[in-house]
């Protein structure tokens, strides 16, 4: 035995259980606001219970998990934590809507070297706000204080979401046909992708995040939360024959559009059908980034691309605009030759 008679505690090792309990009390109100009628019980149990909505005849569960990448580093540098949770929810639920699924519930994982209750409460309040925007319930989560694993009060977040779709209504891209129209739904900014390049551009150019651009600071443009498309997209799906939806995330146009296209088809995008939001123009100029690389890294102002019959395109655009989205016809589906790229931007 050691000659040291002092009694060690978990807190001495860097884990403050009282801080964790204080956080749970702080976030209870935010979590309660996200509740759906299918949720059984409150937070704090070992597992969270949720019934399936009764309106589905053959319900299929759709799941997704994601993080926010190095956008988090920017939030830490700017000491602004109240919207990063919205990003986290958006990255998960927007992947579900691609298959026509309505998000049901969400869980989060928050890991840090030393728990700052105020910062964590801000993050989780943002997660709750994202869940409200998406119409899903925040039913549980894990807060892990891990001294020695993270530097100081640095933290990381991950999210997990489950949604439901009627089996016969699953959107999987198999109906995509030559001649289909492509409509774009506008993004709110870079969303949560490409931030390693964003940070490199800031470093190499020496740009100041407090510099003004179109009435806002560069930092504000870059921390603008990811748009959550659930409510407007569900309305569109209800009223139109949607053949495919692509969520433009990491890998941009070149990587994400082909994921929903059948073999032998390609998306022909009219690059002149929209003007890039100013933040993308600024990033390209400051980083001297080639246009193809921009399309391969960023969403360039396009959050979703939707394939549907040509004769329904204008009505779908009008509906999305009525729901407050920026939407426009961005291109069409054409036949692709063997070995040809599935995305063509003119």
From Swiss-Prot:
Entry's family note: Belongs to the AIR synthase family.
Xref: HAMAP family: AIRS (MF_00741)
Pfam families: AIRS, AIRS_C
Keywords: ATP-binding, Cytoplasm, Ligase, Nucleotide-binding, Purine biosynthesis
Top-level taxon in the UniProt lineage: Bacteria
Coiled-coil ranges (or none): none
EC numbers for this chain: 6.3.3.1
Primary localization class, coarse: cytoplasm
A GO molecular-function descriptor: phosphoribosylformylglycinamidine cyclo-ligase activity
Reactions it catalyzes: 2-formamido-N(1)-(5-O-phospho-beta-D-ribosyl)acetamidine + ATP = 5-amino-1-(5-phospho-beta-D-ribosyl)imidazole + ADP + phosphate + H(+)
CDD domains: PurM (cd02196)
Protein name according to UniProt: Phosphoribosylformylglycinamidine cyclo-ligase
